[in-house]
Amino acid sequence: MILVSTTSAVPGALSSPSSPSNSSQEELLDDRDPLLVRAELALLSTIFVAVALSNGLVLGALIRRGRRGRWAPMHVFISHLCLADLAVALFQVLPQLAWDATDRFHGPDALCRAVKYLQMVGMYASSYMILAMTLDRHRAICRPMLAYRHGGGARWNRPVLVAWAFSLLLSLPQLFIFAQRDVGNGSGVFDCWARFAEPWGLRAYVTWIALMVFVAPALGIAACQVLIFREIHASLVPGPSERAGRRRRGHRTGSPSEGAHVSAAMAKTVRMTLVIVIVYVLCWAPFFLVQLWAAWDPEAPLERPPFVLLMLLASLNSCTNPWIYASFSSSVSSELRSLLCCAQRHTTHSLGPQDESCATASSSLMKDTPS
């Protein structure tokens, strides 16, 4: 049996994959580096506030807009992405923060298993909701009639349900891997640890999670974005046969204003594609690289401060998700500005140009098309 100590949702963090012996029992019970503990608490607190505040603001803006009419399909996906990221904040970052503050997991075995399960649900849901959103955007652009026939303005649709269902199902192994276990041979100190029946179990499981949470969604997102860009390019830029037909009919192949419009649309698509893929990879890569390093290398520097802090960055992508999609959706960004403006007005209780700008922002939303 392999007993693995962890303060991460993924087994292998902050420990070596070996059972503690009597000689290492005192080492397990020693106090941690106080400076490192403060750094961990500060990092987790910052991430929690950033995730909760950013996703709460964007979700509030979407709910505020939804009260005035039917939600656009993209708004449905952004709202569920915000819910998934809020689940990361509440069920992953917050328990992790309490756990780091107390050093050991204090709670019954059922709570240990539930926390580990919900931590993984948040990781899967955040990644799969982005993938579902990208797949739906690909269908809407490349297969518009199919997208129209299936709708998409409902608060729950098929891709959203599939993303949540896969997140709940793929997280089930956490319930059987983790439990409250003695950290040493009869030490009397218990922690929420993972146990694998075979020596290769830890490496296989961490690799599986890296593939399913990071690698596979990243490849799917990148592939869909490339196909979307190709479809937009093909629809906006006429091909050789179409240009020849226009010349035979005496039509110009394009005007300067048309070319500028095409260039602007393509530039926005390229920017969005690059931002989505690059930010996704940059946010997830450090966490999974150190997780795989810890699982596969017995000599990994598990106690080094950079290594320990990188183990806590599983929720980094949840800080950036709402701002990426809000910035590329004119309706969401306008609603968010209106919400912040009105909140500032109610806070200051002042009347003047600020109220006028708030009212102007609110009224302009009625003419904004969902994007």
Swiss-Prot record:
CDD domains reported for this sequence: 7tmA_V2R
Q: Which InterPro entries match?
A: GPCR_Rhodpsn, GPCR_Rhodpsn_7TM, Vasoprsn_rcpt, Vprsn_rcpt_V2
Topological domains annotated Cytoplasmic: 64-77, 136-159, 221-271, 329-371
Which residue ranges are assigned to the Extracellular compartment in the record's topology?
1-38, 99-113, 181-200, 294-308
Regarding tissue, the record states: Highly expressed in kidney (at protein level) and moderately expressed in liver (at protein level). No or extremely low expression in left ventricule, muscle, bone and brain (at protein level).
* Main localization of the protein described in the UniProt heading: membrane
Kindly list the biological process annotations in GO that this record carries: negative regulation of cell population proliferation; negative regulation of urine volume; positive regulation of cell population proliferation; positive regulation of gene expression; positive regulation of intracellular signal transduction; positive regulation of systemic arterial blood pressure; response to cytokine; telencephalon development
Please list every transmembrane segment annotated in the UniProt record, as residue ranges: 39-63, 78-98, 114-135, 160-180, 201-220, 272-293, 309-328
Keyword Glycoprotein annotated? yes
UniProt topology in membrane: Multi-pass membrane protein
One GO term describing the cellular component: endosome
UniProt GO MF annotations: signaling receptor activity; vasopressin receptor activity
Where is this chain glycosylated?
N22, N185
Record keyword Glycoprotein present: yes
Q: Which UniProt keywords apply?
A: Cell membrane, G-protein coupled receptor, Glycoprotein, Lipoprotein, Membrane, Palmitate, Receptor, Transducer, Transmembrane, Transmembrane helix
Q: Which PROSITE patterns match?
A: G_PROTEIN_RECEP_F1_1, G_PROTEIN_RECEP_F1_2
Q: Where is this region: Disordered?
A: 1-27, 240-259, 349-371
- Similarity section: Belongs to the G-protein coupled receptor 1 family. Vasopressin/oxytocin receptor subfamily.
Name used for this protein in its record: Vasopressin V2 receptor
Could you tell me which species this protein originates from? Mus musculus
Organism placement in taxonomy: Eukaryota, Metazoa, Chordata, Craniata, Vertebrata
